[in-house]
């Protein structure tokens, strides 16, 4: 989230090269079959609102991948050198204010990856217009699918060759992007490759910094977002309904899933499952290819949890760098008054104000939590952020171990009520319910009120895009409490 076009291309290509270099080095694939492995590499990219830039981004990536396949990996078959990629149209740019405008944003972002035939996406994943409000209903999802079908079947888009070939503007922009990307690829290669650039947080730090710049540009008005920081006047939308405009997560869904799993486990052949898991464990222990053993596990009826638990025992659990270890301060985004207030409160407390940022549940969207972490650091707080997919127990245990002054939860999965209830319950059980708790996410107004009644100090949604104001809010809550 937040990657610039050159970062997206260079990080994706360097990662692909890392995979192919490793496959080549381990010798499991015969030399004559290696081009087939190259041909199976596929990418998943983002499509943003900058229409021309995004189209040129994919033409650049297509050209560079062809060069890499030809020169680096000696692939001759043109079919195996194609850039195979799917697209997630940019959910980051969807807005809660005037959400009907998101329909146009989604259309434009889709066009940027389908108009240029030579760099056309092979698969497209469109968000729904109301994803900044909550989880989309089947009707909302259908609306997005219909957009793809109209483009494919009603327009003449698929009837022509690439209409951008011969454009000097496009050619110059692509050449400029190529130079920037090649420079970045060289930096990563000198570092030791993509794995090294992940392990030393080089990639993540840059991504968080780019996202911080984007947030700052929106706050200052340098980047215009219609309905958010410009043209905010609006008539009431007939599409927006706080009570029925999106799916609500059933509070019993977890219990129902556990019940189904128990039924499944009781019906399957336990002996067959045990043998399949043992075979998986042996393959992983010997550092062999685990694919065949994993397929056998699936056929035997092994659950995803059992599969991952088996591998976790051998490999451990990987926690990716968060990218918030260092301040990514953007000077124009610096709120000196908040900084002074936090310093004053830290002096009163005889130690630095400490904030815990938590991502509970299966929600993997981390950019909001990262931006809050960075802004809180810049405001003078000590920040504890351990990444995504944490359990309520892990978050509360960290709050106790770190003696934090405030907890900020980021929940975009739609499970904000159940997860918040569980965390508040655990805080009370551990006698630390006096710690202020704030929650951010795609939270309907009706649920905001419920969460405040539960004891949440403040709820933030996409309409609260000004991080300086959020930090000022944090200072208010902390000063009032301590």
What is each stretch, according to the model?
Residues 138, 144-149, 153-337, 400, ...:
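Flexible, glycine-rich loop/tail regions that form catalytic "lids" or insertion modules at the edges
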Residues 117-131, 157-163:
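Short acidic/histidine-rich active-site segments
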């Amino acid at each position: 989230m937040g990657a610039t076009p050159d970062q997206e291309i260079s990080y994706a290509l360097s990662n692909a090269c890392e995979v192919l270099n490793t496959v080549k080095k381990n010798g499991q694939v015969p030399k004559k079959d290696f081009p087939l492995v190259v041909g199976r590499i596929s990418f998943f990219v983002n499509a943003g609102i900058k229409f021309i830039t995004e189209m040129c981004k994919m033409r650049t990536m297509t050209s560079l991948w062809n060069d890499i396949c030809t020169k680096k990996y000696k692939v001759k078959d043109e079919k195996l050198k194609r850039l195979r990629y799917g697209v997630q149209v940019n959910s980051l740019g969807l807005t809660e204010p005037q959400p009907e405008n998101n329909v146009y944003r989604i259309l434009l972002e889709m066009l940027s990856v389908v108009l240029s035939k030579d760099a056309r996406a092979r698969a497209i994943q469109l968000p729904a217009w109301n994803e900044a409000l909550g989880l989309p209903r089947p009707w909302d999802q259908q609306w997005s699918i219909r957009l793809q079908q109209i483009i494919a079947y009603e327009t003449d888009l698929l009837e022509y060759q690439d209409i951008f070939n011969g454009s000097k503007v496009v050619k110059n922009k692509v050449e400029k992007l190529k130079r920037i990307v090649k420079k970045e690829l060289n930096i990563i290669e000198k570092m030791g490759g993509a794995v090294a650039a992940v392990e030393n947080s080089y990639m993540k730090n840059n991504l968080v910094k780019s996202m911080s710049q984007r947030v700052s540009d929106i706050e200052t008005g340098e980047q215009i977002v219609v309905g958010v920081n410009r043209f905010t006047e609006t008539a009431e939308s007939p599409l927006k309904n706080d009570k029925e405009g999106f799916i609500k997560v059933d509070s019993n869904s977890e219990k129902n899933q556990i019940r189904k799993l128990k039924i499944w486990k009781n019906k399957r052949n336990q002996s067959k499952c045990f043998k399949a898991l043992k075979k998986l464990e042996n393959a992983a222990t010997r550092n062999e290819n685990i694919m065949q053993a994993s397929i056998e596990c699936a056929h035997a009826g092994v659950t995803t949890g059992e599969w991952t638990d088996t591998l976790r025992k051998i490999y451990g659990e990987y926690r990716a760098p968060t990218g918030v270890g260092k301040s990514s301060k953007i000077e124009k985004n610096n709120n000196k008054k908040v900084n002074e207030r936090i310093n004053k409160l830290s002096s009163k407390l005889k130690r630095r104000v400490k904030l815990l940022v938590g991502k509970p549940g299966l929600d993997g969207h981390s950019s909001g939590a990262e931006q809050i972490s960075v802004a809180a650091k810049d405001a003078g707080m000590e920040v504890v952020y351990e990444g995504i997919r944490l359990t309520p127990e892990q978050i509360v245990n960290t709050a106790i171990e770190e003696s934090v002054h405030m907890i900020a939860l980021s929940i975009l999965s739609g499970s904000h009520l159940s997860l918040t209830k569980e965390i508040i319950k655990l805080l009370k059980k551990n006698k630390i319910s006096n710690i202020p708790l704030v929650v951010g996410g795609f939270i309907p107004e009706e649920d905001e009120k419920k969460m405040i009644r539960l004891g949440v100090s403040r709820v933030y949604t996409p309409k609260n895009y000004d991080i300086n104001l959020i930090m000022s809010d944090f200072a208010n809550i902390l000063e009032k409490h301590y």
